[in-house]
Amino acid sequence: MAKEKFDRSKPHLNVGTIGHVDHGKTTLTAAITTTLAKAIGGKNKAVAYDQIDNAPEEKARGITIATSHQEYETNNRHYAHVDCPGHADYVKNMITGAAQMDAAILVVSATDGPMPQTKEHILLARQVGVPYVIVFINKADMLAADERAEMIEMVEMDVRDLLNKYNFPGDTTPIVYGSAVKALEGDESEIGAPAILKLMEALDTFVPNPKRVTDKPFLMPVEDVFSITGRGTVATGRVEQGVLKVNDEVEIIGIRPTTKTVVTGIEMFRKLLDQAEAGDNIGALLRGTKKEDIERGQVLAKPGSITPHKKFAAEVYVLTKDEGGRHTPFINNYRPQFYFRTTDVTGVCNLPNGVEMVMPGDNVSLTVELISPIAMDKGLKFAIREGGRTIGSGVVVDIIE
């Protein structure tokens, strides 16, 4: 069967659920798809909870590890939705997921209020540059009707304080309360389906249409690579900037020597595209490229537009112990992992002259030398990680070599 073309008539946004484990992120994602399928119809399809929580090794532990992509639309917009992992061990995936958001829906349980991972995810959203956050206070059905208003008001105040603390506009952020479970059951009371529609309205109105960087040269970080029998190798990822047309030449840059190839096909949500633009999650079919020739962490880019580098100057913020960072300072020649776009690369830190050590909570200018080159430009953001947790975040301020 021929694949249908992807419809671009509505503005497209990438959103995702963030928040503490078991506060209801995946249930909310299911409730959004189900409620919109009923209320608006159109292309909306109800997606069940266990379809979203679908990677097999995760279900055993009842926690979402991978990021799952869903799509839905309101009357005004088309949304691609990532359900982000909530568990602390999987912050790495959160970094790959959250980096892809134009907005995040922070889910907070009405019975618990903000918890450690609520803070961690707001901080991460700030670090990886999620521009807008809106809030859904979930599990309102667990509160006695006579206590509900008072309890929710307390949780709301806590959440607004937290958002302000991490430089989001806590005072003006839309906060909607309800019950994702009730909405999934088709409940029409104010905490059921109507709460979900109210949340969607907040998403439509509070978050402006993102300004896409379509005029910059094409660049797509590679997230995954697989081969399709008889067709060739497909690289998937989110287009970071620019436009890609079928039959465009691209370079594969970073980690290994740079190579060139031609894109012979582009797909998004299993539909064929003539061209992809910034913000699209796509698969690009690459002519004559073997699966072994390309890996996660490389980028596809317009030839000549970006080069791989190992050594750069960076401005770095080192997390405090309370933010989940190191408990002790680090010294010259510290060797953590640097998380660029979709992968970790080990690098050596050189401290500025006269600086003996860097304390948690410090801002510092570092020179970093990576063990393999990464496609980079000034302004590229990264996380610094050690033993599976984020201990700092930074930005490339100058390329040295």
Curated annotation (Swiss-Prot):
GTP binds at residues 19-26, 83-87, 138-141. The keyword GTP-binding applies. Residues 62-66 are annotated as: G2. Pfam families: GTP_EFTU (PF00009), GTP_EFTU_D2 (PF03144), GTP_EFTU_D3 (PF03143). The keyword Protein biosynthesis applies. It catalyses: GTP + H2O = GDP + phosphate + H(+). Residues 10-211 form the tr-type G domain. It is found in: Cytoplasm. It comes from the Bacteria. Keywords: Cytoplasm, Elongation factor, GTP-binding, Hydrolase, Magnesium, Metal-binding, Nucleotide-binding, Protein biosynthesis. Residues 83-86 are annotated as: G3. Residues 138-141 are annotated as: G4. Mg(2+) binds at residue 26. Residues 179-181 are annotated as: G5. GO terms for cellular component: cytosol. GTP hydrolase that promotes the GTP-dependent binding of aminoacyl-tRNA to the A-site of ribosomes during protein biosynthesis. Monomer. This is Elongation factor Tu. The gene is tuf.
